[in-house]
Amino acid sequence: MATVQEKAAALNLSALHSPAHRPPGFSVAQKPFGATYVWSSIINTLQTQVEVKKRRHRLKRHNDCFVGSEAVDVIFSHLIQNKYFGDVDIPRAKVVRVCQALMDYKVFEAVPTKVFGKDKKPTFEDSSCSLYRFTTIPNQDSQLGKENKLYSPARYADALFKSSDIRSASLEDLWENLSLKPANSPHVNISATLSPQVINEVWQEETIGRLLQLVDLPLLDSLLKQQEAVPKIPQPKRQSTMVNSSNYLDRGILKAYSDSQEDEWLSAAIDCLEYLPDQMVVEISRSFPEQPDRTDLVKELLFDAIGRYYSSREPLLNHLSDVHNGIAELLVNGKTEIALEATQLLLKLLDFQNREEFRRLLYFMAVAANPSEFKLQKESDNRMVVKRIFSKAIVDNKNLSKGKTDLLVLFLMDHQKDVFKIPGTLHKIVSVKLMAIQNGRDPNRDAGYIYCQRIDQRDYSNNTEKTTKDELLNLLKTLDEDSKLSAKEKKKLLGQFYKCHPDIFIEHFGD
C-alpha cells in the first residue's frame, strides 16, 4: 500500500500549486476559487508533512495514524508561513476549529470512530493522545474497482463547495466565523521547499532564542553547546537482518497479552518495554504468573522491571541543566504558563528518539500515578511512589534542590498531554524566518528581535537616567517605610542617602 507521501507526490501537487498554474489576477479572497485553493493547500500540507505511522490507541494498534497535536502544529505553521490572512495573529484554538472542519468533511477520521459500540459525533482534540487517519474512498477510475486511494487535496476542496450540505455555510463563512479574512493581496507566494536541514537549523536556533526570553540563565554555555550541535533529521529505525527469534517472540507475546486485556495501565507499560534491553524483556516474559487473570501480579512485575531499568540509566533530560533550575524557579513563583512554554521548548530540543521514549515514560507515569489505578505500595500514595522511583530517570541535576526536582517531575506528570506541543509563539517566529529565507530576504531583519532591541545613544542615556532615578526612589521609600529598622538606624541610613543623592531625597521628602 502506498504511503501518504507517495500518493501526494503522484498527484504532482507542487506543480498544481505553482504560480504558473494560477489563473490571471489570482487572489485568495476570490470566491469560490480562493477558498478552494486555500483548503487544497492546507490538505496537501497536512497529507505530506504530518508524521503518519503505526501507533497505539485505546489498547489497540492502528496503522497509518497521526497525532492530533501534530496536525495542529503543521497547519498552524502553514497558515502563518504563507500569510493567507495577512499579518493577523492566529490563535491555536482557531486552528483546532480548522482541523475540526476537515474532520467533519471526512478529510480524516478519528481512531476509532465508535465508543462502546455507539456512534459518537467526532470531536477533534489537540492532544498527543488522540489519533487520526486519512480517509480513503473507492477508486472509481480503476477498472478493477477494488483499490482504494486518498482523496487528492483538489478533490477534497472541490467536494467541500459542491456538497449541498455546505452551501448554507460555506468554507468562506467558516473563515469569517473564525474571525479570519483572507488577505486581498494578489500575490500569495508559495515558494520552493526548503531543505530539511535548513528547517531544522532554524527551529533549533529560534527554540533556543525563545527559551532565553523565558528563562533567566546565569551562564549560556549549555545553550551555546546545544546550538552548535547539528540538528538530526529523524530517520526510520533500521531493522536488523538477524533478529533473535526468542527475544522477538517474547516481545510479541507481551504485546498480544496487552492487546487482549483492554487495560490502559498495561498498554502504557508494554509500550515502555520497547526501550528495555532484550534480556530484561525475556526475564519479564518468563516470570509471568501462571494465572493470566491476575493482572495485579502482572502490573507489579512490569512496574518493578521498568523502575529498575530507568533507575540505572542516564536521565532522559540530561541536557541544558541550567534550564531545569530556571523552569523550577518559575514554578516556585507561580508562573505556570511560562513554565509550561519553557518546558515545551526544552523538550523540542530533544532528538526524535529520546523525545518519543520520554513521551511514553511520562504517559506511563501519569497513568500509574492515578489513585484509582493499581496500588503500587500499600502504605504510600501512587503519585509519590512514581515520583520517587522515576525522578532520577528524568532529572538528575546536582544544582537542583530535592524540593525543586520533585516539583518539576510532578509538573511534568500533571501536564504530560501538553508538554510535547509546540508553542504558538515559536511557530510564528519560525514561520516568519522561513518565509524570509524562501524569499531571499535577511531573516534576522524580518523575524524581529529575540534578545534585545537596538536603540540610539540618546534613548540609552534617557533610559539609564530614568531607571536609576526610579530605583533610587524605590530604595528611599523602602528605607522610610521599613518598620524593622530602629529610629537610630533609619536616621543614619537616610543621612547617608541624603549625602549621596540630595536631589532624590528632597524630591521625596520636600524641603
UniProtKB/Swiss-Prot annotation:
SMART domains: DEP
Domain DEP: 46-136
InterPro entries, sorted: DEP_dom, WH-like_DNA-bd_sf, WH_DNA-bd_sf
SUPFAM superfamilies: Winged helix' DNA-binding domain
Biological processes, Gene Ontology terms: intracellular signal transduction
Tissue specificity annotation: Expressed in liver.
Highest taxon, organism lineage: Eukaryota
Alphabetical list of Pfam families matching this protein: DEP
Family per similarity comment: Belongs to the DEPDC7 family.
PANTHER family according to UniProt: DEP DOMAIN-CONTAINING, DEP DOMAIN-CONTAINING PROTEIN 7
Protein name listed in UniProt: DEP domain-containing protein 7
